[in-house]
Amino acid sequence: MLDSKLLRTELDETAAKLARRGFKLDVETIRKLEEQRKSIQVEVENLQSTRNSISKQIGQKMAAGDKEGAEEIKKQIGTLGSDLDAKKVELEQVMAQLDEFTLSVPNIPDDEVPDGKDENDNVEISRWGEPKTYDFELKDHVDLGEMGGGLDFASAVKITGARFIVMKGQFARLHRAIAQFMLDLHTEEHGYTEMYVPYLVNSDSLFGTGQLPKFGKDLFHTEPLVEKVNDEEPRKLSLIPTAEVPVTNLVRDTISDEADLPIKMTAHTPCFRSEAGSYGRDTRGLIRMHQFDKVELVQITKPEDSMNALEELTGHAEKVLQLLELPYRKVVLCTGDMGFGARKTYDLEVWVPAQETYREISSCSNMWDFQARRMQARFRRKGEKKPELVHTLNGSGLAVGRTMVAILENNQEADGRIAIPTVLQKYMAGATHIG
């Protein structure tokens, strides 16, 4: 969340910056609440000062032998204490309203982020690789997978429902190989530590990374089937929408040493999303699933290092695509298309031949101190006593299912076989083709 000081001392400037991303800050409501806070705060401080001043008189009265006077002062202090407690409750209520208001406010976009309303206003930065030309009729990944007997959507519908998949044989192995290749690259060459994390998280974790309270409808939540287990209240947990949630929360409520930064972590997990706002979109194939795998990259940095870290992290995701020899383009998201907690975001979009377009395969974001403030994730500089908030970054390195889509379609051959990228062949027992 934003620093509340910005809403107190730079309200108009903050409102103008948020307006760039299409968010209208309710300035009047904030001003009204802030005026109430200041007024009640003054009353609280005055009552505390008066009580402290009068308290000193008790000893003076007792020393002078004036017990009645001392008792009278004690009564006054009791009344002041009751008034003070009531005012503190009022102050807490106003502060709670301000905090609740702040939680609905997105991050401020970086000055370098282009203005715009939606994905149509994103700005292309670069392209890598040339889309192939084919002298035969192209098939999409669904036809290729079903023809090879490796993608079974019908069984997934029977078992669970739409937007799920059953993979078989070499297709399942390819899916595993892609993830393992990514993990090996990021841990062996890019300096990340591999993490294994829970796939179920509590509400504090989802709050920390910004999914709650605003995006609860996009998640899958568990519903306890019994009231108690071994006399313990059942926990209400949620399936992770991305490994960003558990991995980033590893630094929640911690103070790192400056020497330990940056912290670079990666994890391969399934991800679960309700896709509540995606009805009718990408209903065919693996592009938009309720359950999909992803290799996530997370960096925890000092504030002055985070923008350079964003370039580095994005480059690590790009390296995956380059080694797989998949054409892609890099775009910087405009203010209107960025995620709620992002300060700046790059998307990598891979070429999908059957659709004759580039599709998002990775989103890499600098969250600045937005998540860190929610999580109270801090670090202490050498020689300093007061800790500071870290900056957090995350990105897909990459989405496994969409990477598989790109490999199947870009590497298809006239006879229906799929050429396995060279870097994946060692994970496929040396096989060069599927089919």
Swiss-Prot record:
Enzyme Commission number: 6.1.1.11
Compartment(s) of residence: Cytoplasm
Cross-referenced SUPFAM superfamilies: Class II aaRS and biotin synthetases, tRNA-binding arm
Gene Ontology terms for molecular function: ATP binding; serine-tRNA ligase activity
Main location: cytoplasm
Keywords: Aminoacyl-tRNA synthetase, ATP-binding, Cytoplasm, Ligase, Nucleotide-binding, Protein biosynthesis
Domain of life where this protein originates: Bacteria
InterPro entries, alphabetized: aa-tRNA-synt_IIb, aa-tRNA-synth_II, aa-tRNA-synth_II/BPL/LPL, Ser-tRNA-ligase_type_1, Ser-tRNA-synth_1_N, SerRS_1_N_sf, SerRS_core, tRNA-bd_arm
Classification via Pfam families: Seryl_tRNA_N, tRNA-synt_2b
Keyword Cytoplasm belongs to the record: yes
Pathway it works in: Aminoacyl-tRNA biosynthesis; selenocysteinyl-tRNA(Sec) biosynthesis; L-seryl-tRNA(Sec) from L-serine and tRNA(Sec): step 1/1
Family as reported in the entry's similarity comment: Belongs to the class-II aminoacyl-tRNA synthetase family. Type-1 seryl-tRNA synthetase subfamily.
Subunit note: Homodimer. The tRNA molecule binds across the dimer.
Function: Catalyzes the attachment of serine to tRNA(Ser). Is also able to aminoacylate tRNA(Sec) with serine, to form the misacylated tRNA L-seryl-tRNA(Sec), which will be further converted into selenocysteinyl-tRNA(Sec).
Protein name as annotated: Serine--tRNA ligase
Record organism: Vibrio campbellii (strain ATCC BAA-1116)
